[in-house]
């Protein structure tokens, strides 16, 4: 079935703290829109302290309505405001649509579709899905693994097994691009090819993929060769 190139989202495609116009700033704006008395650090703490419930479950990364309600209720309680799931989701999406992303890399990813299979593999909450789709057009991807759907995070061996089961290729025919060391190390343990990079390191990403597929890539995008 050939080769598969798999991309992370945050940091690789979307701007991630401390890069300007990043996801953390969007989260802070979201929380403070419901309670403007919070400082930026307090707003960030509201978010980070409510991602996991008392049983250690990432309720923010579940797809069922009960988990969504439970998560937003926790945010309301810790942040001292009262937003519905729809209100919070709408604001979260609106603020994240303002976040920068690496458009040139997205163009390159779409170009790769004619050469190999492409996948997206990311830990994210349900509110992020519309933003992700707006940035990358999920219909262009052969595979999409999002933690709020798989209920597995990239720090678990099970999710890597799921990816391998879905793609049905040997580990040496998988290339994984991620900005986080632990995710890269987990992929290496499986025998995957890896490239640890941020989205602004397009040349590094391209070089790694060229070595992976075994030849030089050339295409036209916005008048520039890829």
What are these regions (language model features)?
Residues 31-49, 77-91, 171, 215-222:
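Short, surface-exposed acidic
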Residues 22-30, 46, 70-74, 91, ...:
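Alpha-helical elements of Rossmann-like donor-binding domains used by nucleotide-donor carbohydrate transfer enzymes
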Residues 32-35, 61, 146-150:
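A short acidic, glycine-rich active-site loop
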């Amino acid at each position: 079935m050939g080769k598969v190139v798999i991309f992370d989202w945050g940091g690789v495609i979307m701007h991630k703290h401390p890069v300007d116009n990043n996801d953390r700033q969007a989260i802070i704006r979201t929380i403070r829109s419901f309670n403007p008395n919070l400082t930026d650090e307090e707003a960030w703490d509201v978010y980070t302290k409510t991602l996991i419930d008392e049983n250690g479950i990432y309720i923010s990364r579940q797809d069922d309505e009960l988990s969504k309600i439970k998560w937003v209720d926790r945010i309301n309680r810790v942040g001292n405001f009262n937003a519905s799931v729809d209100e919070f989701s709408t604001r979260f999406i609106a603020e994240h649509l303002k976040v920068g992303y690496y458009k040139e890399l997205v163009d390159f990813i779409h170009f790769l579709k004619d050469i190999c299979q492409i996948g997206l593999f990311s830990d994210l909450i349900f509110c992020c899905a519309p933003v992700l789709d707006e940035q990358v057009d999920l219909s262009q991807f052969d595979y999409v693994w999002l933690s709020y759907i798989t209920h597995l995070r990239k720090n678990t061996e099970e999710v890597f097994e799921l990816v391998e089961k879905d793609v049905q290729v040997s580990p040496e025919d998988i290339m994984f691009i991620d900005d986080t060391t632990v995710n890269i190390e987990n992929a290496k343990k499986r025998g995957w090819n890896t490239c640890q990079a941020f989205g602004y390191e397009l040349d590094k990403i391209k070089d790694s993929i060229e070595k992976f597929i075994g030849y030089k890539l050339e295409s036209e995008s916005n008048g520039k060769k890829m």
